[in-house]
Structure formats: C-alpha cells, structure tokens
C-alpha cells in the first residue's frame, strides 16, 4: 500500500498574509470576510493574519511575492475580482494575474492561494462571493491552510 500524505485543516499557530484588491470592493470585501472566517474557524488568531489592500487584481502578484519572500508568513492568500467588460482588458488582466501568482508561489516555495474571481458577469461574481456558489475567499483560505500543513510534512 502506498503512503498517502495530505494537509490537515488546522490553522492554529500558522501565519497568513492576505493581499486583497480594492477594485470591485463590493465583491472583494465579501471574499475577505470569507477568508477571515475560514482562518479563524480553523484556529488562526487575529494577530497571525495581516491584510494588505492593493489597488487592483493586477497588483496582487507583486505584493504576494513580496509577502512570501519576507519570511513572515507561511502562506499568502490573494483575493480579487476581474469581471469581463466590453474590451479585451479582462483577458490580459486575468491571464497575467493567474501567471503572476503561480510564478510567485513557485519562485518562493511559499503557498500562495488563488482567490481571484474571473467571471463574465457581476452576478457570477456575487454568486461566488458568498451566495449560491459558496465563497471563494473561504476556499482560498482553506487551500492555504492545507498547503502549509502538507509542506510541513514533506
């Protein structure tokens, strides 16, 4: 039988940095609420969570990487919302944010959870920020907790 290792969802004693976009704040504030709720319900204390507000989703990768290399956090959580409009701006921003966050995590070895919504409509974003489709901020926080614990075991 193979040995299977997976992270536990216990955040006690873990330190988290959260980078959250101010753009589309009516969505991002709900994502932040979900992430904070997940962290505290899983045992994290307020003193172990730092929130950093960035202008928009495009700025998330840089701040995430800076937080990761600071060695003050065991995981970083990125929260934002990119909603499609009438121009190709959506494609450029969502692609660069996704790549930038992934690269920051791979470059630093620090888990950086992706809680950035990329939706076609405002309604879809609202659904994913705490209504019909759950809260992706919560999901990103749970991913961060699990990854910290898993990496501790490796």
Curated annotation (Swiss-Prot):
Catalyzes the formation of 6,7-dimethyl-8-ribityllumazine by condensation of 5-amino-6-(D-ribitylamino)uracil with 3,4-dihydroxy-2-butanone 4-phosphate. This is the penultimate step in the biosynthesis of riboflavin. It comes from the Bacteria. Gene3D superfamilies: Lumazine/riboflavin synthase (3.40.50.960). 5-amino-6-(D-ribitylamino)uracil binds at residues 23, 57-59, 81-83, 114. (2S)-2-hydroxy-3-oxobutyl phosphate binds at residues 86-87, 128. This is 6,7-dimethyl-8-ribityllumazine synthase. GO terms for molecular function: 6,7-dimethyl-8-ribityllumazine synthase activity. GO terms for cellular component: cytosol; riboflavin synthase complex. The keyword Transferase applies. Keywords: Riboflavin biosynthesis, Transferase. Its EC number is 2.5.1.78. InterPro entries: LS, LS/RS, LS/RS_sf. The active site is at residue 89. GO terms for biological process: riboflavin biosynthetic process. SUPFAM superfamilies: Lumazine synthase. It catalyses: (2S)-2-hydroxy-3-oxobutyl phosphate + 5-amino-6-(D-ribitylamino)uracil = 6,7-dimethyl-8-(1-D-ribityl)lumazine + phosphate + 2 H2O + H(+). Pathway: Cofactor biosynthesis; riboflavin biosynthesis; riboflavin from 2-hydroxy-3-oxobutyl phosphate and 5-amino-6-(D-ribitylamino)uracil: step 1/2. Belongs to the DMRL synthase family.
């Amino acid at each position: 039988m193979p040995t299977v290792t997976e992270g536990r969802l216990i955040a006690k004693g873990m330190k988290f940095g959260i980078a959250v976009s101010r753009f589309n704040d009516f969505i991002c504030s709900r994502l932040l609420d979900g992430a904070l709720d997940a962290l505290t319900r899983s045992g994290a204390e307020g003193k172990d969570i730092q929130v950093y507000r960035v202008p928009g989703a495009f700025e998330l990768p840089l701040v995430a990487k800076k937080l990761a290399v600071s060695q003050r956090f065991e995981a970083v959580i990125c929260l934002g919302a990119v909603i499609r409009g009438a121009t190709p701006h959506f494609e450029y921003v969502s692609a660069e944010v996704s790549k930038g966050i992934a690269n920051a995590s791979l470059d630093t070895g620090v888990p950086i959870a992706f809680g950035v919504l990329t939706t076609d409509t405002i309604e879809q974003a609202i659904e994913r920020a705490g209504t019909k489709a759950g809260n992706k901020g919560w999901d990103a926080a749970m991913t961060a907790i699990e990854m910290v614990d898993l990496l501790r075991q490796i």
